[in-house]
């Protein structure tokens, strides 16, 4: 899957703030959405997710919602152990 659009909510409580709470940036998440290494489904929410390395080498999961075939809305992202 290739996302043409990634929607970020910069308002208080939005997905930008939530990602930053996990010491990640929107650039980290965008990079992994474009260069993921594995896909899956979140066991807690049932949402789709992708796994991959950030440019600085951290292995993260990005949980997102697909609003259409071209658009992803990141819900959360955080560092995880490599498989």
Language-model features: where?
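Ribonuclease/tRNase effector modules and their secretory precursors
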Residues: 1-83
């Amino acid at each position: 899957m290739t996302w043409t659009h990634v929607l970020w909510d910069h308002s208080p409580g939005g997905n930008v703030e939530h990602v930053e709470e996990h010491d990640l940036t929107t650039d980290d998440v965008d990079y992994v959405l474009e260069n993921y290494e594995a896909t899956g489904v979140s066991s807690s929410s049932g949402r789709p997710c992708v796994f991959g390395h950030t440019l600085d080498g951290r292995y993260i999961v990005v949980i997102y919602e697909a609003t259409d075939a071209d658009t992803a809305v990141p819900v959360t992202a955080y560092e995880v152990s490599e498989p």
